[in-house]
Structures are given as C-alpha cells and as structure tokens.
C-alpha cells in the first residue's frame, strides 16, 4: 500500500476516501495522525482552498497529499454557504456543528420557493509540495434542501439534502449507494482517471 496524507481530520471524509481508494492500493492517513495542523482556508473558491491545503500537508508530511474542499451551494442564496459550509453557523455567532450549520441553512431558506442546491467537491492531488502540475478534479451533486432531517448516515448537510429522483436524503443512502453517486465519488473517479494518465505518460 502506498501512503498518502489527507489534508483533513474529518472522520466522515476519511472513511469515504479510504473506502474509495483502498482498491487502488492507497492508504490514506489523516494529517492529524502525522501531527500536521490544519491549513488556513482564506480563499473564496473551492479550488484555491484545496490547493493550499494539499501543498501544506505535503510539505509537512513529506508525502503525496490529497485535499478536498467541498460544500453545499443553495441556489436561492446565491451559492451560500459554499466555501463556508463547515463554519456556516459560526459566521453568524453560533457553534461549529453540523446541527447548527443545518439549522442556519434551513432558517436562511425559509420563505424561498427555490429549495434547489448542489454539493460541490474539488479534489487536489500533489505528488510533492511544489508540484507544478497538481491534479484537480471536481464533482457536483444536485438535490433540494428540506426542513426536517431524515436518515442517520452520512455527515454534514446530508440529512437535509434530498435527492428527488431517489426519494431519499443523502443520509438515507447506504455507504455503497452514496459512494456510487456523490459529488466526492464523481470527483474521485475523475482524479483516478487523471492519475492513471500521468502514470502512463
């Protein structure tokens, strides 16, 4: 198994990445396990944040690094919370928790007829900290935000993210179902394909 560092300590993301990357012979270690502090995320785009996190983790670990920047974008809110998804409630003086973030999103959407939203995931893989050709992949997953949470799986906004075609929220999907269709799975499929192209070039 080849070891790479994940520029995150999010247990939900770590579990998803390990499930999706283990078949490729990659062992994903969270940066906290290697004593690496979290990078700053000062940028206004998912791509810039993911690249900054990947370079930071790779530099401190001396390993290839994979970074994910992801979030949910509500159409009626101009794409908010977007890059601020993980700390959406904090920005309004609330606690940092999934429940608080979901509560703020539902509150902000009250009175809006358009409940459409999409998850975005941008993945950046660097072979080393100064990699001049980082591999960048992106996935989007479209659905609607519902007021009442449903399901016990997933994390983040999943209990409020309804997939109308399936009649389920992301939190009601099995891990296998989610890993087949999620924004992260789409981005990872792109990333794997690009990694293969680079290795065979």
From Swiss-Prot:
GO cellular component, one term: cytosol
Cofactor(s) recorded in Swiss-Prot or TrEMBL: Mg(2+)
SUPFAM superfamilies, sorted: ITPase-like (SSF52972)
GO biological process: nucleotide metabolic process; purine nucleoside triphosphate catabolic process
Keywords on record: Hydrolase, Magnesium, Metal-binding, Nucleotide metabolism, Nucleotide-binding
Binding positions (substrate): 8-13, 70, 155-158, 178, 183-184
Record-listed E.C. numbers: 3.6.1.66
Molecular-function GO terms, alphabetical: dITP diphosphatase activity; ITP diphosphatase activity; metal ion binding; nucleotide binding; ribonucleoside triphosphate phosphatase activity; XTP diphosphatase activity
Active-site residues, Swiss-Prot/TrEMBL: 69 (proton acceptor)
Role description: Pyrophosphatase that catalyzes the hydrolysis of nucleoside triphosphates to their monophosphate derivatives, with a high preference for the non-canonical purine nucleotides XTP (xanthosine triphosphate), dITP (deoxyinosine triphosphate) and ITP. Seems to function as a house-cleaning enzyme that removes non-canonical purine nucleotides from the nucleotide pool, thus preventing their incorporation into DNA/RNA and avoiding chromosomal lesions.
Protein family according to the UniProt entry: Belongs to the HAM1 NTPase family.
HAMAP family, per database record: Non_canon_purine_NTPase
Subunit field text: Homodimer.
Protein name: dITP/XTP pyrophosphatase
